[in-house]
C-alpha cells in the first residue's frame, strides 16, 4: 500500500541525529516525514543523561547557532551545569549539563510536534526503494510505502543490533527496543563498505540504596551557565549535585578474575568499542597500574531515584556487575535497577559519503549519526542537522553545503569522517581542530547564524536576537576605541588603582583591555561605563585580548584556502598522473576526494603528491581551453 501523499524528505529514526535532521529540513520549508519505531522514544537519551563536554559543547552550540533543538532542550531540562576548563583559554572551555532524561525527551517531542512542515509516523523501516542508483522512498514493517527523493538514515545502534550481558546475547536496538534486522540485510545489499562497532552502558542504581555521605559532592557552577544562545538560567529546572567515588583494589580484583566471562575478552564481541569511553573491564586491563578510577554518580532526573554511575560501563555477567558495584565505597548496599550491557551494531564506512553526507553511490540517500561510525549525542545531532539541511537543499534544487574546517567543528567532524574514515567510534575533541582559537563555543553564532539564515534554518526571533548581539559588539568596540584615558586624571588614577598598571601616556579603553592584567568588568567599573549584555562583553574581551593570535590564524587560513577549495573532477584518473606512486594512486582512487584539501589529509598522501595533482589540474584546464579555442 502507498501512503496517500508524497514527501520531499524522509528521515528514518527519532534519536538525536534524526530529530535534528527532521527539524532542519522542515524549518527550511520542505515537506518532511519523521519515521520512528516508537513515538514515545523520540529524543531519548540512550546512554548517559548529559549533554556537552570538551569538544562536544562546541558542536551543541553550532547546532544551536543553526537553529537546532539540542541546546534549548538542554536548558529546559538541565539539572546541573558546569563550565569545564574554566581556568584555561576560551578556545578549550566547554559547557556540560546533566539533563533530566524525562524532561529532555518531553521537550524534544514538543518541539517536533509543533514544527510546521513536519509529519511524524510510527513504524519501523524495513526497506529502501531504489531505482537506477537513486532513492525513491521507503517501505515500513507493515508494507506501507512512503515516497520521497531524499532519505536520511539515522539508525543509531539499531542496525543489526546485538546486546551482550556476559556470554549471553540477544537481538536489540537498545535495552527494551527491537533491532532493525530487515533494514540491516537490505543495507548490506548496497555497494557500501560495512563494519561492526560496539558501545556500552553501566548498570543503573537505585539512589535510595546509596550512601552519599562517604562520597565527594560535586555541585554545579554559580552563576548557572546556559547552553543555548537563546537560553537563560530562568529556563532551568531545580539544580542538583553529582557525587564522586572511586573503584578500588577489590573492584579491580573482581573484574580481573572474571575477564573470561566478559564478551569483550572471550571473543564474543567483534565490534571495536569507543577508545575515549572504555568499559570498566577495559580500563582495568589497559591501565593495570592504576589503583583506582573515578566514578561519577549522576542523577537521571528530578522525579526518579535512578542514578547513572559514569565510569563503570560493563558487559560482564549480572552477578559480577552486582559484586563490582557493591565493592565501591558508598554503594555497598546498592540495588541495580537495570543491568549494564554492550551493544554491537552495523556502521558504514563514511569515506563512501560526500561532504553533504549523501552517499556517493545512491543519489538522495544520506547518513547521519552512529551509522557513520561516530559516538555521542552531540556528534549525532551535528550530522543530523547537516544531513537534513542538505536533503532539503536537494529537494529545493539548491547547492549542498558543509562548513569548512576553519568555519566549524561540524566541518572538522565531517572532513575527518569522509577523508580518514574510522575504525572505532569517533568522538569530537578540541584537539582535532587546527583553528580552535577561532572555533570557540562562545562565538558559534557569530560564525554560523548568518549562513543559517541564508539557508532558511533561522527564524525571525533568533535572527533579531543575533543581529542585536552582533551590532552590540560592534558598537561597544567602537566606544572602547574612541574613549581615551589620560594619566593624572581621575579616570586614569582609577585604572592605576584597579590594575596596578602605570599610564605613561593616553590609551584608548580598547588598548587597555588588550593588556593581560586588565579585565572588561574591572575596566568598566574603573572608568564608569555602563554594564552591557554579558554575551556582548565576553565577545569584545576575547576578540581584543586574542586579536594578534586570531589575525595570524586568519592569515594562515587565507593562504591555505586557495588550494583547499580546488575541486577535483569526478572522472579524474589517478593512474594516468605520472609521478604518483601506486600506493597514492590507490588511496586517491579509493577515497575519491572532492577537493585538493581533502586529498592532502588522506594518510600517506604527501605534499609532493598534492603538487603533482595541482600541476595535472592546471594542464588539464589548459588542454580544455585549447580544445575550446580550436
From Swiss-Prot:
MF GO annotations: flavin adenine dinucleotide binding
Residues engaged in binding FAD: 13-18
Gene3D superfamilies, sorted: FAD/NAD(P)-binding domain, GidA associated domain, C-terminal subdomain, tRNA uridine 5-carboxymethylaminomethyl modification enzyme MnmG/GidA
Database matches in Pfam families: GIDA, GIDA_C_1st, SAM_GIDA_C
Listed SMART domains: GIDA_assoc_3
One annotated GO biological process: tRNA methylation
Keywords tagged on the record: Cytoplasm, FAD, Flavoprotein, NAD, tRNA processing
Location of this chain's protein in the cell: Cytoplasm
PROSITE patterns in the cross-refs: GIDA_1, GIDA_2
Cofactor(s) this protein cannot do without: FAD
GO CC, alphabetical: cytosol
Residues that hold NAD(+) according to the record: 273-287
SUPFAM superfamilies tied to this protein: FAD/NAD(P)-binding domain
Cytoplasm keyword on record: yes
PANTHER family attached to this UniProt entry: GLUCOSE INHIBITED DIVISION PROTEIN A, PROTEIN MTO1 HOMOLOG, MITOCHONDRIAL
NCBIfam families documented for this protein: mnmG_gidA (TIGR00136)
Job description of the protein: NAD-binding protein involved in the addition of a carboxymethylaminomethyl (cmnm) group at the wobble position (U34) of certain tRNAs, forming tRNA-cmnm(5)s(2)U34.
Subunit structure: Homodimer. Heterotetramer of two MnmE and two MnmG subunits.
Family label: Belongs to the MnmG family.
HAMAP family for the chain: MnmG_GidA
Protein name in the entry: tRNA uridine 5-carboxymethylaminomethyl modification enzyme MnmG
Lineage: Bacteria, Pseudomonadati, Pseudomonadota, Gammaproteobacteria, Pseudomonadales
Gene that produces this protein: mnmG
Amino acid at each position: 500500500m502507498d501512503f496517500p501523499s508524497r514527501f520531499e524528505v524522509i528521515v528514518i529514526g527519532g534519536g538525536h541525529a534524526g530529530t535534528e535532521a527532521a527539524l532542519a529540513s522542515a524549518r527550511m520549508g520542505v515537506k518532511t516525514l519523521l519515521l520512528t519505531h516508537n513515538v514515545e522514544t523520540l529524543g531519548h537519551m540512550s546512554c548517559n543523561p548529559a549533554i556537552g563536554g570538551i569538544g562536544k559543547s562546541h558542536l551543541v552550540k553550532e547546532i544551536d547557532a543553526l537553529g537546532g533543538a539540542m541546546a534549548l532542550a538542554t536548558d529546559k531540562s538541565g539539572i546541573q551545569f558546569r563550565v569545564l576548563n574554566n581556568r584555561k583559554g576560551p578556545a578549550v572551555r566547554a559547557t556540560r549539563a546533566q539533563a533530566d532524561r524525562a524532561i529532555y525527551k518531553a521537550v524534544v517531542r514538543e518541539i517536533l510536534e509543533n514544527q510546521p512542515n513536519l509529519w511524524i509516523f510510527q513504524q519501523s523501516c524495513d526497506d529502501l526503494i531504489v531505482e537506477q542508483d537513486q532513492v525513491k522512498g521507503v517501505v515500513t514493517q507493515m508494507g506501507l510505502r512512503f515516497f520521497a527523493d531524499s532519505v536520511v538514515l539515522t539508525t543509531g545502534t539499531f542496525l543489526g543490533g546485538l546486546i551482550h550481558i556476559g556470554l549471553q546475547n540477544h537481538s536489540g536496538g537498545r535495552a527494551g527496543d527491537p533491532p532493525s534486522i530487515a533494514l540491516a540485510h537490505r543495507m548490506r545489499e548496497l555497494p557500501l563498505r560495512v563494519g561492526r562497532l560496539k558501545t556500552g552502558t553501566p548498570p543503573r542504581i537505585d539512589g535510595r540504596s546509596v550512601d552519599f555521605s562517604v562520597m565527594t559532592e560535586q555541585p554545579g557552577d554559580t552563576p548557572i551557565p546556559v547552553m543555548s544562545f537563546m537560553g537563560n538560567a530562568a529556563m532551568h529546572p531545580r539544580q542538583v549535585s553529582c557525587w564522586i567515588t572511586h573503584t578500588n583494589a577489590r573492584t579491580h580484583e573482581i573484574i580481573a578474575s572474571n575477564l573470561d566471562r566478559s564478551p569483550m575478552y572471550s571473543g564474543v564481541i567483534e565490534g571495536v568499542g569507543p577508545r575515549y569511553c572504555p568499559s570498566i573491564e577495559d580500563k582495568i586491563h589497559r591501565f593495570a597500574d592504576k589503583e583506582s578510577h573515578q566514578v561519577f554518580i549522576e542523577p537521571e532526573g528530578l522525579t526518579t531515584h535512578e542514578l547513572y554511575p559514569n565510569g563503570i560501563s560493563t558487559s560482564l555477567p549480572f552477578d559480577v556487575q552486582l559484586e563490582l558495584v557493591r565493592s565501591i565505597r558508598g554503594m555497598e548496599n546498592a540495588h541495580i535497577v537495570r543491568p549494564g550491557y554492550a551493544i554491537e551494531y552495523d556502521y558504514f564506512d563514511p569515506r563512501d559519503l560526500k561532504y553533504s553526507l549523501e552517499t556517493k553511490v545512491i543519489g538522495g540517500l544520506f547518513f547521519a549519526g552512529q551509522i557513520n561510525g561516530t559516538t555521542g549525542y552531540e556528534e549525532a545531532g551535528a550530522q543530523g542537522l547537516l544531513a537534513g539541511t542538505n536533503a532539503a537543499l536537494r529537494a529545493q534544487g539548491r547547492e549542498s553545503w558543509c562548513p569548512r574546517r576553519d568555519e566549524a567543528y561540524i566541518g572538522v567532524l565531517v572532513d575527518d569522517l569522509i577523508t580518514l574514515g574510522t575504525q572505532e567510534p569517533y568522538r569530537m575533541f578540541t584537539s582535532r581542530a587546527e583553528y580552535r582559537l577561532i572555533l570557540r563555543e562562545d562565538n558559534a553564532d557569530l560564525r554560523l547564524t548568518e549562513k543559517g539564515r541564508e539557508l532558511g534554518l533561522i527564524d525571525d526571533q533568533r535572527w533579531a536576537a543575533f543581529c542585536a548581539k552582533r551590532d552590540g559588539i560592534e558598537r561597544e568596540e567602537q566606544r572602547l576605541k574612541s574613549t581615551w584615558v589620560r594619566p593624572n586624571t581621575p579616570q586614569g588614577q582609577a585604572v592605576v588603582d584597579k590594575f596596578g598598571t602605570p599610564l605613561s601616556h593616553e590609551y584608548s579603553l580598547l588598548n587597555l583591555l588588550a593588556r593581560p592584567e586588565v579585565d572588561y568588568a574591572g575596566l568598566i567599573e574603573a572608568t564608569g561605563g555602563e554594564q552591557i549584555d554579558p554575551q556582548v562583553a565576553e565577545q569584545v574581551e576575547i576578540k581584543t585580548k586574542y586579536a594578534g593570535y586570531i589575525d595570524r590564524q586568519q592569515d594562515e587560513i587565507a593562504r591555505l584556502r586557495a588550494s583547499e577549495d580546488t575541486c577535483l573532477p569526478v572522472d579524474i584518473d589517478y593512474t594516468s598522473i605520472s609521478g604518483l606512486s601506486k600506493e597514492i594512486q590507490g588511496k586517491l582512487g579509493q577515497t575519491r576526494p572532492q577537493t585538493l584539501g581533502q586529498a592532502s589529509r588522506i594518510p600517506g598522501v604527501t605534499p609532493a603528491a598534492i603538487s603533482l595533482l595541482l600541476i595535472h589540474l592546471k594542464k588539464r584546464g589548459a588542454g580544455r581551453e585549447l580544445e575550446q579555442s580550436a
